[in-house]
Amino acid sequence: MATSKSGGSSKNGRDSISKRLGVKRSGGQFVRAGEIIIRQRGTKFHKGKNSGLGRDHTIFALKDGIVEFKTSKGRKYINII
Protein backbone atom coordinates (compact mmCIF):
# COMPACT_ATOMS: atom_id res chain seq x y z
CA MET A 1 0.00 0.00 0.00
CA ALA A 2 1.02 3.57 -0.52
CA THR A 3 2.61 5.16 2.52
CA SER A 4 1.80 8.76 1.47
CA LYS A 5 -1.41 10.36 0.28
CA SER A 6 -1.74 11.60 -3.27
CA GLY A 7 -0.90 15.29 -3.81
CA GLY A 8 -3.62 17.72 -4.79
CA SER A 9 -3.69 19.17 -8.28
CA SER A 10 -2.82 22.83 -8.78
CA LYS A 11 -5.18 25.25 -10.50
CA ASN A 12 -2.28 27.47 -11.64
CA GLY A 13 0.23 26.98 -14.43
CA ARG A 14 -1.45 28.64 -17.43
CA ASP A 15 -0.50 31.76 -19.35
CA SER A 16 -1.81 33.11 -22.66
CA ILE A 17 0.56 34.16 -25.43
CA SER A 18 1.05 37.92 -25.81
CA LYS A 19 -0.84 39.58 -28.67
CA ARG A 20 1.87 42.17 -29.51
CA LEU A 21 -0.52 45.11 -29.36
CA GLY A 22 0.51 48.76 -29.26
CA VAL A 23 2.04 51.58 -31.28
CA LYS A 24 4.26 50.31 -34.12
CA ARG A 25 5.17 53.71 -35.65
CA SER A 26 5.67 56.89 -33.61
CA GLY A 27 4.58 60.44 -34.41
CA GLY A 28 6.91 62.15 -36.88
CA GLN A 29 8.03 58.83 -38.36
CA PHE A 30 7.85 58.18 -42.12
CA VAL A 31 5.55 55.33 -43.23
CA ARG A 32 4.75 53.73 -46.55
CA ALA A 33 1.24 52.83 -47.72
CA GLY A 34 -0.02 49.65 -46.04
CA GLU A 35 2.29 49.85 -43.02
CA ILE A 36 0.69 49.17 -39.64
CA ILE A 37 0.76 52.14 -37.26
CA ILE A 38 -1.19 50.73 -34.28
CA ARG A 39 -2.54 47.34 -33.22
CA GLN A 40 -5.32 47.70 -30.66
CA ARG A 41 -8.42 46.15 -29.12
CA GLY A 42 -11.32 48.49 -29.80
CA THR A 43 -10.86 52.05 -31.05
CA LYS A 44 -8.58 53.61 -28.47
CA PHE A 45 -7.18 55.52 -31.47
CA HIS A 46 -9.37 56.52 -34.43
CA LYS A 47 -8.43 56.72 -38.09
CA GLY A 48 -7.78 60.18 -39.47
CA LYS A 49 -6.60 61.57 -42.79
CA ASN A 50 -4.95 59.00 -45.10
CA SER A 51 -5.21 56.18 -42.53
CA GLY A 52 -7.46 53.12 -42.59
CA LEU A 53 -9.11 50.93 -39.96
CA GLY A 54 -8.88 47.13 -40.24
CA ARG A 55 -11.57 44.76 -39.01
CA ASP A 56 -9.48 44.01 -35.90
CA HIS A 57 -9.22 47.81 -35.28
CA THR A 58 -5.66 47.97 -36.62
CA ILE A 59 -4.80 51.41 -37.99
CA PHE A 60 -2.64 51.44 -41.14
CA ALA A 61 -1.33 53.99 -43.65
CA LEU A 62 -3.24 54.47 -46.91
CA LYS A 63 -0.53 56.72 -48.41
CA ASP A 64 3.18 57.35 -47.90
CA GLY A 65 3.83 60.15 -45.41
CA ILE A 66 4.58 61.24 -41.86
CA VAL A 67 2.57 59.91 -38.88
CA GLU A 68 0.75 62.56 -36.83
CA PHE A 69 -1.13 61.92 -33.58
CA LYS A 70 -3.90 64.45 -32.92
CA THR A 71 -6.52 64.82 -30.16
CA SER A 72 -9.88 66.38 -30.95
CA LYS A 73 -13.04 66.37 -28.81
CA GLY A 74 -11.61 63.75 -26.46
CA ARG A 75 -10.65 61.34 -29.26
CA LYS A 76 -7.16 60.46 -30.44
CA TYR A 77 -6.78 60.49 -34.24
CA ILE A 78 -3.95 59.28 -36.44
CA ASN A 79 -3.25 61.25 -39.62
CA ILE A 80 -0.70 60.70 -42.37
CA ILE A 81 0.55 64.05 -43.68
UniProtKB/Swiss-Prot annotation:
Disulfide bonds: none
NCBIfam families attached to this UniProt entry: L27
Stored Gene3D superfamilies: 2.40.50.100
Signal peptide: none
Protein family (similarity comment): Belongs to the bacterial ribosomal protein bL27 family.
InterPro entries per UniProt: Ribosomal_bL27 (IPR001684), Ribosomal_bL27_CS (IPR018261)
GO cellular component terms attached to this protein's record: cytosolic large ribosomal subunit
Keyword line: Ribonucleoprotein, Ribosomal protein
Highest rank taxon of the organism: Bacteria
Location of region: Disordered: 1-24
Protein name as annotated: Large ribosomal subunit protein bL27
Biased composition (Polar residues): 1-11
Entry keyword Ribosomal protein: yes
A GO term for molecular function: structural constituent of ribosome
GO biological process, one term: translation
